[in-house]
A protein has these predicted regions:
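Cleavable N-terminal export/targeting peptides
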Residues: 1-35
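Transmembrane beta-barrel domains of Gram-negative outer membranes and organellar outer membranes
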Residues: 30-242
Length: 242
């Protein structure tokens, strides 16, 4: 099986789009890194970060991701970055990469909510073929000082199977005690089940984030059915801000 075939399962190509969609956030934002559900915030021009994580599954699938990003001034602040990922699925390896960007449409102010827009695309570096593209609209509600709720909706086109999917997600970030944050989320795809009954089943993650200093996060996460393969996933992540 070559790299293109590795992503022939719509669940894998599609979830990679969601999981690596533009989740580039400022220092005060929480659910970035390996978490899928995005918030609507971006940072200030000149802020940069690198998010990296490794995930292993009970069925022996594997995912390693690194995402460098900086906020630039392009008339409006834009978080521009790239994704590089290495995957193993059904025993076969593949490498993919692509650009992504995010803007904030409604800032998080006294009204207690914010709205954003992000998009990304990926290419399989083994074959040179585009895997797919994703657009996402994140909506953030600051429920309390220590509790934030994020709701996502969007669209994904998987070029490996020439199918489109609606995308959805909802999550919470609860900073119940310094320096720990509990983060949980449910997300998935809406559309025709072309392959595999678990492709459009809901997916979920819950994890604990330790922030020993304002420039670093360490994540430990448990996930279920992350790529529509009905497996358990364990993730360790590291986020650096500068």
């Amino acid at each position: 099986m070559d790299g293109m075939q590795l992503f022939s399962r719509p669940s894998v190509a599609a979830l990679l789009m969601i999981a690596t969609a533009c989740r580039l956030m400022p220092t005060e934002a929480i659910a970035d890194g390996a978490f899928v559900v995005d918030d609507a915030l971006i940072g200030k021009p000149g802020e940069c970060k690198v998010e990296s994580w490794v995930s292993v599954a009970s069925n022996h699938d594997f995912l390693a991701v690194t995402q460098p990003a900086c906020v630039i001034n392009a008339g409006i602040p834009v978080e521009a970055g790239a994704t590089l990922l290495r995957t193993r699925s059904d025993g076969e390896w593949s490498t993919s990469a692509g650009p992504k960007a995010k803007i904030n449409i409604i800032p998080l102010g006294d009204q207690g909510f914010a709205l954003g827009l992000s998009g990304n695309t990926l290419w399989n570096l083994n074959t040179g073929q585009n895997i797919g593209s994703n657009i996402n609209v994140p909506f953030t509600i600051q429920a309390t000082k220590d509790l934030r709720i994020n709701i996502n909706g969007g669209w994904l086109y998987d070029t490996t199977v020439h199918m489109g999917y609606g995308t959805y997600g909802a999550g919470f970030e609860w900073n119940f005690v310094q320096p720990l944050t509990l983060i949980g989320e449910v997300f998935g795809l809406a559309g025709q089940r072309k392959e595999g009954r678990h492709v459009t089943d809901p997916r979920a993650q819950i994890g604990l984030r330790w922030t020993p200093a304002e420039f670093i996060d360490i994540d430990v996460i448990y996930g279920r059915n992350l790529f529509g393969e009905n497996a358990n996933w364990f993730t360790i992540g590291l986020n650096l801000r500068f």
